[in-house]
Curated annotation (Swiss-Prot):
<keyword id="KW-0732">Signal</keyword>
<feature type="signal peptide">
    <location>
        <begin position="1"/>
        <end position="31"/>
    </location>
</feature>
<dbReference type="GO" id="GO:0016540">
    <property type="term" value="P:protein autoprocessing"/>
</dbReference>
<keyword id="KW-0378">Hydrolase</keyword>
<dbReference type="InterPro" id="IPR021109">
    <property type="entry name" value="Peptidase_aspartic_dom_sf"/>
</dbReference>
<dbReference type="GO" id="GO:0016020">
    <property type="term" value="C:membrane"/>
</dbReference>
<feature type="domain" description="Peptidase A1">
    <location>
        <begin position="281"/>
        <end position="600"/>
    </location>
</feature>
<dbReference type="InterPro" id="IPR001969">
    <property type="entry name" value="Aspartic_peptidase_AS"/>
</dbReference>
<feature type="compositionally biased region" description="Low complexity">
    <location>
        <begin position="87"/>
        <end position="99"/>
    </location>
</feature>
<dbReference type="GO" id="GO:0016485">
    <property type="term" value="P:protein processing"/>
</dbReference>
<keyword id="KW-0064">Aspartyl protease</keyword>
<keyword id="KW-0645">Protease</keyword>
<dbReference type="Pfam" id="PF00026">
    <property type="entry name" value="Asp"/>
</dbReference>
<feature type="active site">
    <location>
        <position position="299"/>
    </location>
</feature>
<keyword id="KW-0472">Membrane</keyword>
<dbReference type="InterPro" id="IPR033121">
    <property type="entry name" value="PEPTIDASE_A1"/>
</dbReference>
<feature type="region of interest" description="Disordered">
    <location>
        <begin position="87"/>
        <end position="116"/>
    </location>
</feature>
Length: 643
C-alpha cells in the first residue's frame, strides 16, 4: 500500500484519503474549532475491560490549592486553572542539555510539580503508575493509573506542513467522498493491520478492489500504491521480496482472504484502501556530520525512518529539503548494499539504505540505519508521493515489531542511551498555524490539565488501548457487551474513524447541515461525542469535531474505515480531530510494566503559543516559511474559527 515511501509516512496513497482526509482537518480548509522492545506483553492479555454497569468517571479538572496543600504539604504555589483553560504559573526550571552538533542550545523550559498527580491519586483512589506492578484488574491489579508528571528532558517544536491550503481542500473532498460513497453506494472501506507501509494500516498492491477505490476518487491515482514489503536487494543473489516485511503475523491477518472475520465481507461492497497516512505537523532532525536539518513527520503509526536524498532530482523532490550523503563525514552505505525498489501502478520509487549519525534535540544517535529516496516517478509522474505533500522524511515512533527492515528504530536507540527520565514522549498539537510540540522523557504540565490518565497498551504493535464505550450526547453509541473494541492513537492521520457499522449511525445522529457561523448558538444543535476509556470520559464538543466543507456544510470529521481482525473493532483517533484537543503520552514498557498511553485535556492559550514560538525561533533547523502558513479568517461566531 503505500506508496509513499519516504517522504512521508504513508503517503497519501490510498487513503491517503483517509489520512488525508484527516488532514483535511488540518484543516484545512475548514475545520471548526473553538477560539529495547517491550517486555510487558504478559500484562497485555490480562487487561480487563470495563463492566457495562460501571459508571464512567467525569473528566477531572484541577485540584484546588487547598487540596494540594492539605494532601501533599507542598510549598509550591500553584494557581488554579480557570474554566477558560489558562495554564498555571509554576516556579522552577529544568534545562535541557545543548545539542552536541549545533551551536544553538535546546531551549530550557519550566516544569511543574508532581504534587498535582499525587494529590489527585490520593483523592481519587487511582494509583500512580509507578506503583502498579500489574494491570490485571480482574486479579487485583491496576486498570488504569495516573502519570507522575515527571518533567520532560526536552521539547521539539513542530510546525504545520507546507502547502496546507491545497492539501486541506483535497483531504476535505476525500472526506466527503468517503461519506457519499459509503452512504449512497453502500460501499465499505477497509485496511488491514500490518499491510501498509512500515507495517502500518493499509493493503498490499494487487489486492482485489484497489482500482475501485481509485474509481471512487478515494485513492488518488496521483499517489503511489506500493508497499514497503516490496523492498528488494538487487545486489545479492536473493532478489526476492523480503519476507513478512512490516507485517503482523497473526493468522487472522496473514491472509487477506481470512481477515474479514467481523461483520465485513470481502465482496463487491468492500473496497480496500492503500494507506491512511497523512500528517499536518513536522518536527526537526539533523542528519550526518555536520548535521543537515530536515523536517520530517513524527508518526506514532509506523516505525521506519526515511528521508529524501539529494540524488532525487525529480521536480517534486527538489521542492523539499534533501539530505546530501556526500556532504556528511559519517555517512556510509549499507553493506551489503540494499536497493529499495517500490513499484506501483503508474510509477516507481527507488532508493537505498544508509547509516549515519542523527541529531534529535540534545541526543546524538550514532550509526542509525535509514532509508534514502533517490528517485521517484520513473517515466510517469503519476503516483508521485511528493506531488501533493511536501514531506521531507518520516520518523516512526511505533514499536520495533513494525520495522520493515529489521533494524533498530531511532526512538529505541535514544532509549538505549539511558538518559531519558522516562521512556516516553508526548504530543501537544496546537490550533491552526501555531507551533506544536513533541516532548521526550516526560511531560510539561503547562500544556495540559492534570491528571494524565494512563492506560495499558493492549498489543505492542500500534499504540492502542481498550475502548469501553462511545456516547453521542447521552445515548450510548458503542460498544455492545461482549465485543472487543479499541482505539489507536495515530499522530500520522488527521481524522477520527469508525467501522462501517457505526459511521452510518453517526451521520444519522449528526447529519450535515449548512454552517451558520453568525449564530453563536449554532453548535448547540449538535451533541457532544464522548469516548470512555478505562472508565474515564474524554468528550469532543461540536466545535472540536466539526469541519466546514466548500459548500459551507458542517459535518463531523469522521471517516468510515474497517480494520478487520480478531482483535476487535478499531477506532482511530487522529492528530487534528482528537490529539489537538488532548495532550497525549506514549510510554514504553520498562520490563516490569506494560507500555502505556496517556490522555489529558490540552491547554491552549496565548502564553503557550508565545512560548513555543520563541522555542521555534531558537531551535536548530526549525523554520516556517510564510508561504507555508495557512491563512486564517476571522469568523463571526466567537466560539469558532476556521483553520
Amino acid at each position: 500500500m503505500e506508496g509513499r515511501t519516504t517522504a512521508g509516512r504513508a503517503t497519501p496513497a490510498g487513503f491517503w484519503l483517509f489520512s488525508c482526509c484527516l488532514a483535511s482537518v488540518l484543516w484545512s480548509a475548514n475545520a471548526l474549532i473553538p477560539a529495547g522492545k517491550s517486555a510487558g506483553s504478559s500484562f497485555l492479555a490480562a487487561t480487563s475491560s470495563q463492566s457495562s454497569e460501571e459508571a464512567p468517571r467525569e473528566f477531572p479538572g484541577h485540584l484546588s490549592n487547598s487540596q494540594i496543600a492539605s494532601e501533599t504539604g507542598s510549598a509550591l504555589k500553584i494557581e488554579e486553572i480557570a474554566s477558560s483553560g489558562s495554564a498555571p504559573e509554576v516556579s522552577g526550571a529544568a534545562g535541557a542539555s545543548a545539542s552536541k552538533t549545533s551551536e544553538k542550545p535546546i531551549r530550557p523550559y519550566h516544569t511543574g510539580p508532581s504534587s498535582r498527580s499525587s494529590a489527585y491519586s490520593a483523592s481519587s483512589g487511582i494509583p500512580l503508575c509507578h506503583t502498579c506492578s500489574s494491570f490485571d484488574a480482574a486479579n487485583g491489579g491496576c486498570r488504569l493509573c495516573v502519570h507522575g508528571e515527571v518533567a520532560s528532558d526536552f521539547l521539539m517544536p513542530m510546525m504545520p506542513i507546507r502547502n496546507i491550503d491545497t492539501h486541506r481542500e483535497e483531504t476535505l473532498s476525500r472526506l466527503e467522498a468517503n461519506h457519499r460513497t459509503h452512504l449512497n453506494e453502500k460501499k465499505n472501506f477497509y485496511v488491514l493491520r500490518g499491510k501498509g507501509p512500515f507495517g502500518s494500516l493499509g493493503n498490499l498492491p494487487g489486492t482485489p478492489g484497489l482500482d475501485a477505490a481509485i474509481a471512487f476518487g478515494l485513492s488518488s491515482p496521483d499517489l503511489p500504491s506500493a508497499s514497503f514489503a516490496q523492498i528488494k536487494n538487487k545486489d545479492s543473489s536473493d532478489s526476492g521480496d523480503v519476507a513478512a516485511v512490516g507485517e503482523e503475523t497473526d493468522s487472522a491477518v496473514a491472509d487477506g482472504s481470512k481477515t474479514l472475520d467481523l461483520d465485513l465481507k470481502l465482496a463487491e461492497t468492500s473496497v480496500p484502501i492503500l494507506q491512511m497516512k497523512d500528517s499536518q505537523y513536522v518536527g526537526v532532525i539533523g542528519i550526518g556530520t555536520p548535521p543537515q536539518f530536515v523536517q520530517p513527520i513524527f508518526d506514532t503509526g509506523s516505525t521506519n525512518l526515511w528521508v529524501v536524498g539529494s540524488k532525487c532530482t525529480d521536480d517534486t523532490c527538489t521542492k523539499v529539503t534533501r539530505f546530501d550523503p556526500s556532504a556528511s563525514k559519517t555517512f556510509r552505505a549499507a553493506n551489503p548494499p540494499v536497493h529499495l525498489d517500490i513499484t506501483f501502478g503508474t510509477g516507481r520509487i527507488e532508493g537505498s539504505t544508509g547509516i549515519d549519525d542523527f541529531t534529535v534535540g540534545p541526543f546524538l544517535v550514532k550509526g542509525q540505519s535509514f532509508g534514502l529516496v533517490e528517485s521517484e516517478g520513473g517515466h510517469n509522474m503519476h503516483g508521485n508521493i511528493f506531488k501533493t505533500i511536501n514531506f521531507e522524511g518520516i520518523v516512526g515512533l511505533a514499536f520495533p515489531e513494525m520495522s520493515s527492515t529489521g533494524t533498530v528504530p531511532i526512538y529505541d536507540n535514544i532509549i538505549s542511551q539511558g538518559t531519558l527520565k522516562e521512556n516516553e514522549f508526548a504530543f501537544y498539537m496546537a490550533k491552526g498555524s501555531q507551533v506544536s510540540a513533541l516532548f521526550f522523557g516526560g511531560v510539561d504540565p503547562r500544556f495540559y490539565e492534570a491528571p494524565i490518565h494512563m492506560f495499558p497498551v493492549t498489543r505492542e504493535h500500534y499504540w492502542e488501548t481498550s475502548l469501553d464505550a462511545i456516547y453521542i450526547g447521552d445515548k450510548k453509541f458503542c460498544c455492545e457487551e461482549g465485543t472487543k473494541n479499541y482505539v489507536i492513537l495515530d499522530s500520522g492521520t488527521s481524522f477520527n474513524t469508525m467501522p462501517s457499522g457505526e459511521l452510518g449511525k453517526l451521520l444519522d445522529m449528526i447529519p450535515s447541515k449548512e454552517c451558520n457561523l453568525d449564530d453563536p448558538e449554532f453548535t448547540s444543535d449538535f451533541p457532544t461525542i464522548t469516548y470512555v476509556i478505562g472508565g474515564v470520559k474524554f468528550p469532543l464538543t461540536p466545535e472540536q469535531y466539526l469541519v466546514r466543507s466548500k459548500k459551507n456544510e458542517c459535518k463531523p470529521a469522521y471517516m468510515q474505515i474497517d480494520v478487520p481482525s480478531q482483535f476487535g473493532h478499531a477506532y482511530i483517533l487522529g492528530s487534528v480531530a482528537f490529539m489537538r484537543h488532548y495532550y497525549t503520552v506514549f510510554r514504553r514498557s520498562d520490563g516490569t510494566r506494560p507500555s502505556l498511553v496517556g490522555i489529558a485535556r490540552a491547554v491552549h492559550n496565548d502564553d503557550n503559543s508565545a512560548y513555543l514560538s520563541n522555542v521555534l525561533n531558537e531551535y536548530p533547523g526549525a523554520h516556517i516559511r510564510k508561504e507555508d502558513l495557512m491563512m486564517e479568517r476571522s469568523m463571526s461566531a466567537p466560539s469558532m474559527r476556521e483553520l
